Design a protein with these regions (language model features):
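Active-site cavity-forming subdomains of large catalytic enzyme subunits
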Residues: 1-161, 174-180
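Hydrophobic core segments within long, regular secondary-structure runs in both alpha-
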Residues: 162-172
Length: 180
C-alpha cells in the first residue's frame, strides 16, 4: 500500500500499523494467543500489508527548511489541512522504528530514473519495491528453492533446475495471459 505524503489521510496511515502492533503486544501480555494461526491474531489489522509513504523532493525540502506541508484533496487538489513537514517525517520515522512500516518511496528520484518515461509516470511499486513501472502494469514474481536441486552427493542438478525454470516461465506466461 502506497500513500502520497500530501494525502489528507497520511497521518492516520503512518500510524495504522504501529497502533495495531501495540494492540497485539497488549493482548499477548494479557494472555491471548498471538501466534499467526490464532483467532486472537486475526483481530490485528494491517498485518498482511507492506505500507510505504511516497515523498517528493518538495516535501524533503520543506522538512529541511522547517516549512509547513499541505495535505490536499484527491478530487480537486484543494488544501484540506496544513501540517509541519518535520513533524510528519518524524512520525514516519517513529512509526517505522516501532514496526518497520511505513517505508519511504522517493517519487522524484524514482521518476527521474524511470527507464521508459514516455509511457507515463510511476506512482507506486509492488510491495517490496523491486519492480517499478506505470499504473496497471503487472509484477509477477516467482522463486525457486535452490536447495531442492542439491543432489545427495552435494552436486547441483542442472537438468532438473533447467526443467523447473522452464515450468516456472510457462506458469508465469499463463498467469500474464489469463490476467488480461
Amino acid at each position: 500500500v502506497v500513500l502520497d505524503v500530501a494525502h489528507p489521510d497520511i497521518e492516520e496511515f503512518i500510524w495504522c500499523k504501529a497502533k495495531e502492533e501495540r494492540k497485539a503486544r497488549v493482548l499477548e501480555q494479557a494472555g491471548y494467543d498471538m501466534s499467526l494461526d490464532s483467532p486472537d491474531w486475526a483481530s490485528i489489522q494491517y498485518q498482511n500489508a507492506n505500507n510505504s509513504v511516497r515523498v517528493t523532493d518538495a516535501f524533503m525540502e520543506a522538512v529541511v527548511e522547517g516549512k509547513e506541508w499541505n495535505l490536499t484533496a484527491r478530487t480537486d487538489g484543494s488544501v484540506v489541512e496544513t501540517v509541519d513537514a518535520r513533524a510528519l517525517l518524524k512520525d514516519i520515522a517513529e512509526a517505522s522504528w516501532q514496526c518497520a512500516d511505513p517505508g519511504v518511496q522517493y517519487d522524484t528520484t524514482i521518476n527521474a530514473w524511470h527507464t521508459s518515461p514516455n509511457t507515463g509516470r510511476i506512482n507506486a511499486s509492488n510491495p517490496c519495491s523491486e519492480y517499478m513501472h506505470i499504473d496497471d502494469s503487472a509484477c509477477n514474481l516467482s522463486s525457486l528453492n535452490l536447495m531442492k536441486f542439491r543432489k545427495e552427493d552435494g552436486e547441483f542438478d542442472v537438468p532438473m533446475f533447467e526443467h523447473a525454470v522452464d515450468v516456472m516461465f510457462l506458469a508465469q506466461e499463463i498467469i500474464v495471459g489469463y490476467s488480461s
